[in-house]
Amino acid sequence: MMARDTYAYRQVAVESVEWNGRVEIHPVSGQAYATELNVQCSRRMSDTSIYPLGTIFLVSAKLTDRMGGPQYLYVWHGDEIKVMAEQDAEVFLGAYRRVRL
């Protein structure tokens, strides 16, 4: 049996949140990733003049670390920014929960 590839890109729902006085992007609750996990992505996603606080995005991300530092989700900055409607996010998270069972 092969070890699980933790560096593969996976679809993840993330959202803009206020964190320590700044706007940051973190995973939406209900997935395999902690909501405290940082997401490195395009700065445009945290620009509240474009996307209001609480906007949910669907990204292709991989779990990584930088030279043994803390883990974070990496999203290539050149990827298309996909905004999810709240209903679409609920469907995505519901499908994710069913797959995990």
Which functions belong to the PLM regions below?
Residues 1-19:
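Structural detector for short beta-strands of small beta-barrel domains
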Residues 15-17, 40-42, 76, 84:
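A structural detector for beta-sheet-dominated domains
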Residues 19-22, 68:
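Short acidic/glycine-enriched loop/turn segments that link adjacent beta-strands
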Residues 21-38:
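Short, basic/aromatic beta-hairpin or loop at an interaction surface
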Residues 29, 43, 61-65:
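Short glycine-rich, polar/acidic loop-and-turn segments at beta strand-coil junctions
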Residues 44-59:
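Short nucleic-acid-contacting surface segments enriched for D/E, G, S/T with interspersed K/R
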Residues 64-96:
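OB-fold/S1-family single-stranded nucleic acid-binding modules
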